Amino acid sequence: AIRLKEINTETAAFTLSYTIESSAGDINTFYNVNEYYRLRWTDSKVYLLDFERRMAENIGLADITVSSGALRLGIGDASDIDYASYGTDQQQYTWVTGDQQLWLYDNTNRIMTKVYTEEDDNHNCGRQDEAGIKVVHADPETGDLYFIVYGYMHSGNYEGREGVMVYHFSHEDVLLEDLVFIPFNKGFEQMRSGLEELAYMNDDGTLYLLLEDTVYAIDVNMGKMDVAYKDLNSSNCTASGDGIFVMCDGGDENAGERLKIVDLNSGKERTVEGGDWRIVPLGYAGRDLIYGLIDPQMLTEDSSGVIRTPISEVHILDENYNEVKTYQKSGDYVMRLTISDGNISMKLAKAIKNGNYTDYQDAGEDYIIRNIENDDQKIYVDKQKDSIRGQQNWLHLNTSDSFVPISQSARYLDPGYDISRKYEDTDQVEMQYYVYTKGRMDAAFATIQEAVDYGTTYAGTIMTSHKQVIWQKAGRAYIWDRILTVLTRPAVHRA
């Protein structure tokens, strides 16, 4: 399948998706390949501005093996793999997602179940890139999974529509069923940005989803959907993996007067006051909450007319809300903060007065290292190489045995009636700036300056939440003569 990603008078970007079969010895393997091209053309030349090929192995039931305690996940990008172990002292499970598939491994009985896959044997209409899977609850007693699939619905009763489908997988019955479908017509970017912040289900069967500026509470057993919190700024919200949701309260769209912290498991609420400062949540590192304080006098326009949110202080609270770290650097402001495991990276800048405006000059980066306790430290993914397939991903399962587990696929139960629920659509769209790299949405920002900084670093294209492309950065070009077909292999020279 060929998908046009962007086009204007001089440049175009598209992706080419296809499946290939590889034979090595007695092994036949299928791979899903996605190629990204970005081109610029003139009257006589075609320039290849960017190219990337990504490939992921299409793991089938016959491909499942455990070698020296590691489950083979095949060739692919390890960053696309998510996993977790759960269960009781008597029964352990591990779920893993990757390449738009969900698998469940019964560690105790050595049974591997393909719970969900986007592929449909009855269709051959090509894969859709704009889709995601997220496990929202794993029951340690029964082994059951609850998860959402969001984006383009590739098959089923809602095939061809975009939205969020809530699924339940019964481990005992090996049965997959649809619970609720929420249509969403504002685009994948808006959907993904909210669900990445909050998609969580508690033990009582209440699922919380952030869509646009509203948190919805869904009773998955009754199929009832209500509004839990509304009129939020999703850029100023965050959530922990165990159901602690943080939002700004008071203030304006840039920052709040206090943080409102809600435990979605118990319903208990508490606040963190900003005092004379404005306050914003920045994210979670494990169970540690990170937030920033902003001097209200610094919430002013820069010379481009955009209000910046320079953070003067960064604070870290542990799960008991004790302050364990404070960061500030005289003369510098934190303009962007990213969290990866226990590593906190901060982009710094100095304020420069420019007439009636305040601009910011790059002042490098700084870091905070937190020792985050990993609940799944005995379960991890690494790469190993063999003589046939080369580098592959392996999921280590806290055992040293080698064996071929029992493999099975979940049966699907059609509910037989309409399970769609309408969310509170709004004509107002919160302005966000989405940075696309290699044809995929890579990051979202509340200000254009942050988006441009990121796009400059990673050669991206910026699109607003109103579907307007406003900025592009070209990469290094490779040249074809115009008479050559773009997708052949011509002789090239570097521009």
Question: Predicted segments — roles?
Answer:
Residues 18-22, 43, 352:
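Beta-strand elements of well-folded, non-transmembrane domains
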Residues 46-74, 101-127, 158-190, 210-230, ...:
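Surface-exposed loop/turn elements that mediate protein-protein interactions on large endomembrane-trafficking
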Residues 4-12, 41-44, 283-287:
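A short, structured loop/turn motif at beta-sheet edges
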Residues 30-36:
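Short, surface-exposed coil-to-beta transition loops
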Residues 94-99, 147-153, 197-214, 241-253, ...:
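Beta-strand C-termini and the immediately following turn/loop, strongest in propeller blades
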Residues 280-292, 297, 309-324, 334-347, ...:
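C-terminal, active-site-flanking charged/polar segments
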Residues 74-89, 130-144, 190-203, 236-241, ...:
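Structural signature of eukaryotic scaffold interfaces centered on beta-propeller domains
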Residues 2-27, 133-141:
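Surface-exposed, charged secondary-structure patches
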